[in-house]
Amino acid sequence: DGRLKAPGKLSSLTPEYGQCAGSNQSPVNLSGLVKADLAPLQFHYQAGGKTLVNNGHTVQVNYAPGSTLELDGMHFELKQFHFHAPSENLIEGRSYPLEGHLVHANDKGELAVVAVMFEPGQANGALSQAWQVLPAKAGEIHAFKEPISAEQLLPAQHDYYRFSGSLTTPPCLEGVRWLVMKEPVQASQAQIDAFKAVMHHPNNRPVQPLNGRLVLE
């Protein structure tokens, strides 16, 4: 699977990797930060995590309809969240041991991804619940007894960095609104290690060039 063996050379593999050689790719090293009057993010989340799937390149929680993010005067519905270890994005050169991506879409199909950095510390409530049924093998899918709330993945402060980027896995679709939380959240080292154990390999795409894109804060 090329996604696992050559995450940095996705564009050269097959046609479905179409935009992976584009100039607005993710992840990035968030640097050269530009002060901007970014509107506060408005999260309207409810407990909606239904199933947990190991798709071979991440572990993903699929979310029931009804949880939204208000951004740019539009409602973006939370579709799923998943994880990367180590982090894909860097904040001024700093890597974190784990990064969560909360993937949202509006009714036009436009995407907004909220990225949350994890640092070792206290156990995270959402991960405690999810990892009880952590699927060990690619293709496994497990249902939760009780729905999980993505709100437990968010930091207390919702200050963020913003840039325009892409999906970090094929087809590397560009035009994605990226919102990277400034404040990290905590996960226990055991939680981080459990994710890494089922992945068997780092699942972060290498940092892509900014190519003149601005990172707003």
Task: Indicate residue ranges for each PLM-predicted region.
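Alpha-carbonic anhydrase
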Residues: 1-217
